Design a protein with these regions (language model features):
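ABC ATP-binding cassette signature C-motif
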Residues: 1-174
Length: 174
């Protein structure tokens, strides 16, 4: 069963066509990696798959009740917040009843232990790990990850690779 279908997609920015008649189907439990040179529409395809952008033509549909979590290439945060204030905002948006325990566990696993630290003080790798914690602590059917290992050290990239191999949901990543 297709969880996600992108059919005959066209997407252009000003006069530059990035996707022209592209089709993509993702089934339950399928893991797909997208490769290509810079500027060829990989990130655009992920944003379309995550429902963050609309195609110029074609259709993007997901199966009923499918939840998609998206990790952008460069996550954005409110730099005036502490790590924990940011996580609390995400917890308050969730319907899960025990998100606080799950969040603290995921943050520890990813090496984020100074919860009172301002986000503005985090390194690029710490920011990426915070963004990963944010999406991995919430249940979903499909993970859409745009260059999830950039800014991560070797050990954390290896941990993420192992986590994604064991993860039972569907995955699209660049």
């Amino acid at each position: 069963m297709n969880l996600l279908s992108l059919e005959n997609i066209t997407k252009a920015y000003t006069e530059r066509v990035l996707l022209d008649g592209a089709s993509f189907f993702l089934q339950e439990g399928e893991k797909v990696g997208i490769i290509g040179i810079n500027g060829t529409g990989k990130s655009t395809l992920l944003k379309l798959a995550a429902g963050l952008e609309e195609p110029d033509t074609g259709s993007c549909t997901k199966a009923n009740h499918v939840v998609i979590r998206y990790l952008p290439q460069t996550p954005e945060f409110d730099d005036s917040c502490t790590v924990w204030e940011h996580v609390e905002k995400k917890i308050s948006e969730s319907t899960q009843w025990d998100m606080e325990g799950e969040a603290k566990s995921m943050l520890r696993t990813l090496g984020i232990v100074r919860l009172e630290q301002k986000i503005s003080e985090l390194s690029g790798g710490q920011r990426k790990r915070l963004a990963l914690a944010e999406i991995l602590m919430q249940p979903c059917d499909i993970l859409v990850l745009d260059e999830p290992t950039n800014h991560l050290d070797h050990a954390m990239a290896a941990w993420l690779e192992d986590y994604l191999k064991r993860w039972r949901g569907s995955l699209i990543m660049v």
